[in-house]
Amino acid sequence: MEGVSALLARCPTAGLAGGLGVTACAAAGVLLYRIARRMKPTHTMVNCWFCNQDTLVPYGNRNCWDCPHCEQYNGFQENGDYNKPIPAQYLEHLNHVVSSAPSLRDPSQPQQWVSSQVLLCKRCNHHQTTKIKQLAAFAPREEGRYDEEVEVYRHHLEQMYKLCRPCQAAVEYYIKHQNRQLRALLLSHQFKRREADQTHAQNFSSAVKSPVQVILLRALAFLACAFLLTTALYGASGHFAPGTTVPLALPPGGNGSATPDNGTTPGAEGWRQLLGLLPEHMAEKLCEAWAFGQSHQTGVVALGLLTCLLAMLLAGRIRLRRIDAFCTCLWALLLGLHLAEQHLQAASPSWLDTLKFSTTSLCCLVGFTAAVATRKATGPRRFRPRRFFPGDSAGLFPTSPSLAIPHPSVGGSPASLFIPSPPSFLPLANQQLFRSPRRTSPSSLPGRLSRALSLGTIPSLTRADSGYLFSGSRPPSQVSRSGEFPVSDYFSLLSGSCPSSPLPSPAPSVAGSVASSSGSLRHRRPLISPARLNLKGQKLLLFPSPPGEAPTTPSSSDEHSPHNGSLFTMEPPHVPRKPPLQDVKHALDLRSKLERGSACSNRSIKKEDDSSQSSTCVVDTTTRGCSEEAATWRGRFGPSLVRGLLAVSLAANALFTSVFLYQSLR
């Protein structure tokens, strides 16, 4: 130890370097040990390729796991294929069967899925299953031309197994209705996104504070204008000059023979006492600066104009304000007046002095306002009104998974793959529909069905009797028996009649629509597909669903279908029963909710074109209520007119005040 101490006393730097070396070696050893013995994570978060849901799985199963949400297998190779064989893809008996037993649920909740037997007949449903099986068993002649051959084969199957006319009419009606709802969702999302962006821009621009150099430049411009105003008021009388200092220069065009009396005005005596408190050399410098500025007023005006322009450039486009632009215009006008006075010299008229003084006073007032108001920005302050949809405030498009579309399993049964999933019609019961009250019509039942079952828009919004468009859409008091789930008639909502029940109904049957749907496609305007809307690459979540709820797969026997499998069934007459008191109260509440907008609907519906609009096309209706009559000149020009009158009043008051002060002080 004594030897080590003597060595450290002889070479202190060697001891310090040795300590640092030992510390570095220890740290490197600890780091290498941690790297060598690093523990792999036990679990990791993965994302499902099919339903885009995140799931926590063991680390070893990060490329081979089953999604608990959609029950799909996630395990892929580099070429995109599965990394293990899945026999359920080509063996039908390995697929699990979906239970058709009705689940115990709240009867007030709407039915999200309908039976395929309601939309397609038995023959068309069998044809769809056959097409899927034949397309799945397709083997190309040449593997390199698989895409071309499968497209040709698919077209051949479509031509061979066509839908019948009633099924085709029902499918097209569903597609049309879904297009309307999707267009309304997309447009509403765009308008809300635009409103949120404008609000964010307004908050951002109003909260941005001007930099310090911009505030200093505005204050300097105000001081220059105040100096010009003070010179115009007191420059000729010499109130700021003490008796022994340098005499003040007279303004251009002033009378040099008038010698001011230094002891006649009490204000001048007060200024002399104030200047007497300053040191003598400082007072001399101030008097020299006063005389220099009074003799070079044009240069001071040019300096003020340059200061305003520089402040606007430094502030930038976001902090650009109207008051800064107005102040710059006043400085430019003041510079022009001074140049005109120098050009005219002794022949300058008297009104030019009055105009110059008025402009200087107004510029001083505006400059003071611009220098003080440093936080209020007026960039995108003006808000443009957005387009509203009927019933938008009442929750027309809720964020509940009412429009969720199921993702069928890859290995699912072929029959369940082709079951259509129409949208939920709960928003149609919640919104305020523009409809006219019921009116009795002498038209017959076949005529009303012929008009209602056309593929185009409904020509008339009035319905007689029950007002139901389809034979399968009737109140639950006429259709449902004991033990069945009551369903309501959403197509009665579409047609403008009162709903028969607060619950949505299944898809309509299309019996009797063969004759009405044959020639209607040629005379109707084509629908705008939702895919044509340009979202500019934004990810639009149309069908959000809560994380704890998974969409259920629809079944072909969720609802009671006819025993013989046919669509065209005759319903036996039923004795009308007295509905329960709770159902009557609920129906009355829903009826009063739907009749809120009937006062203005009588006037607005008459203006609609029967060939291009429908009673339920909430997308084409872009105003709320009777907005066409409410948008008068008061709503359009009211704010602008008030602002214009206020600006004219302020300008006139400032002008007359400056003229009065100038005349009284002169």
UniProtKB/Swiss-Prot annotation:
PTM annotation (Phosphoserine): residues: 441, 444, 450, 454, 466, 477, 480, 529
Single GO term (MF): actin filament binding
Residues modified as N-acetylmethionine: 1
Cellular compartments annotated: Nucleus inner membrane
Coarse class of the protein's main subcellular location: nucleus
Pfam family, one: DUF2448
Biased composition (Low complexity): 508-520
Parts of the chain that traverse the membrane: 214-234, 298-318, 323-343, 357-374, 645-665
Residue ranges annotated as Nuclear topological domain: 1-213, 319-322, 375-644
Keywords: Acetylation, Angiogenesis, Cytoplasm, Cytoskeleton, Membrane, Nucleus, Phosphoprotein, Transmembrane, Transmembrane helix
Membrane topology: Multi-pass membrane protein
GO cellular component, one term: spindle pole
Residue numbers spanned by region Disordered: 502-581
Keyword field contains Transmembrane: yes
Keyword Nucleus: yes
GO biological process: angiogenesis; centrosome localization; fibroblast migration; nuclear envelope organization; nuclear migration along microtubule; positive regulation of endothelial cell migration; protein localization to nuclear envelope
Perinuclear space face residues: 235-297, 344-356, 666
Record's subunit section: Interacts with SUN2 and LMNA. May bind to Ran GTPase; has a greater affinity for Ran-GTP over Ran-GDP.
Similarity comment: Belongs to the TMEM201 family.
Function, in words: Critical regulator of angiogenesis and endothelial cell (EC) migration. Promotes the migration of endothelial cells, which is essential for angiogenesis. Interacts with the linker of nucleoskeleton and cytoskeleton (LINC) complex, which plays a vital role in connecting the cell's cytoskeleton to the nuclear envelope. This interaction is essential for maintaining cellular structure and facilitating the movement of endothelial cells, which is critical for proper vascular development. Involved in nuclear movement during fibroblast polarization and migration.
Name the UniProt record assigns to this protein: Transmembrane protein 201
Gene symbol of the encoding locus: TMEM201
